[in-house]
C-alpha cells in the first residue's frame, strides 16, 4: 500500500482503483467505491456546513448501518475527529463522553430496541453540543435526509480539508470500558488506525474478492477498524448487520 496513511487518501485511492467494485452493501442501500467517495464528500460538506471545523470532535451513537460507515469516513474527510459511542450506553453515560470531548455534533440513532436514548439526553448539560442528526432505525424519526439537504460547504473546500489531513493527526477517540474506574479516551492517529487493520487483513488474507459480514459493532475497535477500515484498505465488500440475527446472517 502506497501513499498517505490517512482515511481520506485511502478512500480517494480506492475510488480510483476499485471504482465500480462493491464497497458497502446493505438491504437499504449499496455503494461502489466511487459512489461511497461521492457520498462521503457530500456528507462531509454537510458536516462542515454545520460549522464543524478540522480538529472538532464528532460523535456517532448508532448501531451498524450504512449511515455509520458514511458518517465515519465523512468526519475524517472534513478533518474532524470521530468519537464512537456504545449503543448500550444510557443517556447519562453518553452525555459524560459528549461533555468531556466537547463534541459540537452528535450523529445519533432514532428509536432503537424500544428506547430513544438520544431523546433522553439533557441538552442543557451539554453546552458544546450544537447539533444532533438522527439516523432512522425502528421508525420514521430520523433527520438524516434533512441534514443532507441542508446548506453545505463547496466540495472544493471538502477536498482541501481531506488533502490537509496528515498521518499523525488524531483520527478517533475510543473510550475504554471503564472496568476498574471511569472510562478513558484513547487517541489514535490516522497512521495507527489504518496500520493495525491493514496488518490484520494481511494476516487474514482479506482481499477485494471477499465479502465481509460485519456483526461486530462499529462503535468498538473490532467493527470499526478490523471491519470498516480493513475493508476500505483491501477492497473487500463490507456487509454490516444491525444486530446479530442467525437466520439473516446465513
Question: Model-predicted segments: where are they?
Answer:
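Conserved AMP-binding/adenylate-forming core of the ANL superfamily
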Residues: 2-7, 12, 20-73, 90-95, ...
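Conserved AMP-binding/adenylation subdomain of ANL enzymes
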Residues: 194-211, 219-250
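Conserved pre-ATP/AMP-binding loop-to-beta segment of ANL
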Residues: 4, 19, 134, 152-175, ...
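Conserved AMP-binding A3 loop
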Residues: 32-35, 171-195
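Short hydrophobic alpha-helices that are characteristic scaffold elements of the AMP-binding
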Residues: 73-78, 99-100, 220, 229-233
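Structural core segment of the AMP-binding/adenylate-forming
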Residues: 49-50, 77-146
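Conserved S/T- and glycine-rich ATP-binding loop of Class I adenylate-forming
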Residues: 58, 75, 106, 170, ...
